[in-house]
Regions:
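Conserved beta-alpha junction segments in alpha/beta enzyme cores
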Residues: 1-97, 101-138
C-alpha cells in the first residue's frame, strides 16, 4: 500500500547580529537588583531575523527575535515603524518575539530620567536600525 506523505517547500533565510546595549545603560529589571546601571557586559545580546515564504508567490512572513525580556507598546510601535520605513515590510508581515532574558534590562522610554536612562532612547534607535540592516540581508 502506498501512502502519500504531504510535503511542502518554502523559501527560508536567516541573519543575526549583535544588539548589545552600552555597558552603563539603565539596567534594573527586577526588585532584587542592587544597582541601576549595568556595570559591564557578561554576554552580548543578539537579534535574529528569519524570512519564511512559499516556494512561489509573494507572501512573506518575517520573524524578528530579540534578546530582550519584553518591549512596551510605544517601543514596539517605534521599532515596527522604523522597520516598515526602512524595508518596505508591512507591520502585519512581522512577528517580534523575545528570548525573555532579564539580563537585558527593561528598555522602557519612561525610564529616561533614571541613572543611565538617557541611553535607552538612543539604544532603541540603534536597535531598530540594526534590525533593518539584518532584514536587508535576507530580503528575497
Amino acid at each position: 500500500m502506498h501512502v502519500d506523505t504531504p510535503q511542502s517547500c518554502c523559501r527560508f533565510a536567516i541573519a543575526h547580529g549583535d544588539i548589545t546595549p552600552p555597558a552603563d545603560i539603565y539596567h534594573r529589571m527586577w526588585g532584587a537588583a542592587k544597582h541601576d546601571r549595568a556595570t559591564g557586559i557578561h554576554q552580548p545580546l543578539r537579534a535574529t531575523v528569519i524570512l519564511l515564504a512559499p516556494a512561489e508567490g509573494d507572501e512573506r512572513q518575517f520573524i524578528i527575535a530579540l534578546d530582550h525580556c519584553v518591549m512596551g507598546r510605544r517601543e514596539m510601535d517605534n521599532l515596527l515603524e522604523v522597520v516598515s520605513k526602512g524595508t518596505g515590510i508591512a507591520h502585519a508581515d512581522c512577528i517580534v518575539v523575545f528570548s525573555h532574558t532579564h539580563a537585558a534590562g527593561l528598555m522602557g522610554l519612561e525610564r529616561a530620567d533614571l541613572p543611565g536612562g538617557d541611553l535607552i532612547a538612543p539604544y532603541l534607535e540603534d536597535l531598530s536600525k540594526r534590525v533593518v540592516e539584518l532584514l536587508s540581508l535576507i530580503h528575497i
